[in-house]
Amino acid sequence: MENKKSPEIDAVIAWVDGSDPELIKRQQKYLKLEPNKNLPGAQKTRFNSLNEIKYCLISILKFAPYLRKIFVVTDQQDPNIYPLVQKHFPKRVSDIHIVDHLEIFEGFESFLPTFNSICISNMLWKIKGLSDQFIYFNDDVFIVRPTNPSTFFKNNKPVLRGKWRLPPYERIL
């Protein structure tokens, strides 16, 4: 009997510190905002940082220890996570990688900066060293109990959860 090794699974976390003065300057420049004026969807409170990245990272390390690498994707920012990982998960420090938008937008630099999470998530496949199977987190998503690879993948395919809903007119059939 052939011994098949389970595929490696990585985690990718999208993160931004919306209170970073340099980020705010870039946003104002590209969104052509006047100081203290917001566009719908670009309100300051939407990007406030409450250390979500640290909760997210610790939850992954604690409840999904089988994940091989964790990539934190950001735009010229430092999430300052290494001291926390060193303190609580010292053997995992080398598994945490900060990835700048410049890396994933290589060849598409003219589209930077971008503040659009859809654009960013569409470029994650360009992360160097990323496994074919990975779990994508926003920094405000946390794992709250132990998981295993089959929580996310079965037969090398992603597990989808939720309910299929019929359009209202089909419910009467």
Name what the model sees in each region.
Residues 10-19, 24-25, 101:
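Short loop/turn segments at strand-loop or loop-helix junctions that form parts
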Residues 18-46, 162:
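A solvent-exposed, charged loop/short amphipathic helix patch at secondary-structure junctions
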Residues 19-23, 78-83, 106-107, 142-146, ...:
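Short catalytic/ligand-binding loop motif for oxyanion handling, primarily in non-cytosolic enzymes
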Residues 38-44, 48, 80-130:
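Active-site-proximal specificity loops/subdomain of glycosyltransferases
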Residues 59-67:
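Short, acidic, metal-binding catalytic loop of nucleotide-sugar glycosyltransferases
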Residues 68-77:
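Short beta-strand/loop segment that forms part of the nucleotide-sugar
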Residues 131-144:
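Short beta-strand-to-loop acidic/aromatic patch adjacent to the donor-nucleotide binding site
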Residues 144-173:
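Conserved donor-nucleotide/metal-binding helix-loop-beta segment in metal-dependent transferases, i.e.
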